[in-house]
């Protein structure tokens, strides 16, 4: 296939990035390659067994995560890349006019994703409600989970209830060990490694 100019592709598909959708899939086979725009704010945190790659092409975004059990705010600025390790709760927040690339790997048939709400979005120290589900299409498969949360007593009271808002034995264990490295400029990295790359050497963007 022919190479694709990302900015030209974005202009052609700009209507797909209007709210409430704000994203469009470019490729799906082994890897899901999607572009996500804004505005997009959410109160849930997503967990998955694989890593996620972010490249912020236009504008900035914020990515609250839960690292070692504590909330941490990752700011991914225009031109920066970031690799989110597996099994870390994360909640992408995108501003109007922003535009970025996200790459996820295809899920295994027996693999479940998680969607979680906390009693306090700013602290993330107590789980309010969560569900685990098979995810083959993020935009489609999240909808019934979000609707189930909105219909729950926990959503109304913002307090953990006796009706099983939290999964006692989750099929996906949260990573409580990994410390996340900060985002960095892709252009600066390319310039730093220009000599090696020009000689055809293969380098890992994330060692």
PLM feature segments, named:
Residues 1-81, 89-207:
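Jelly-roll (double-stranded beta-helix
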């Amino acid at each position: 296939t022919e190479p694709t100019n990302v900015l030209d592709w974005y202009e052609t598909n700009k209507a797909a990035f209007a709210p409430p959708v704000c994203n469009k899939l470019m490729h799906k086979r082994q890897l899901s390659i999607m572009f996500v725009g804004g505005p997009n704010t959410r109160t849930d945190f997503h967990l998955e067994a694989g890593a996620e790659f972010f490249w912020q092409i236009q504008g900035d975004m914020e990515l609250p995560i839960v690292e070692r059990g504590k909330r941490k705010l990752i700011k991914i600025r225009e031109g920066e890349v970031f690799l989110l390790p597996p099994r870390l709760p994360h909640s992408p927040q995108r501003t109007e006019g922003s535009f970025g690339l996200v790459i996820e790997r295809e899920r295994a048939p027996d693999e479940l994703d998680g969607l979680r709400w906390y009693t306090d979005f700013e602290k993330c120290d107590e789980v309010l409600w969560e569900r685990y589900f098979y995810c083959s299409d993020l935009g489609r498969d999240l909808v019934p989970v979000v609707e189930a949360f909105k219909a729950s007593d926990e959503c109304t009271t913002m307090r953990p209830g006796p009706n099983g808002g939290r999964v006692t034995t989750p099929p996906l264990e949260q990573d409580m060990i990994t410390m996340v490295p900060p985002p960095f400029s892709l252009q600066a990295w390319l310039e730093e490694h220009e000599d090696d790359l020009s000689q055809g050497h293969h380098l890992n963007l994330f060692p």
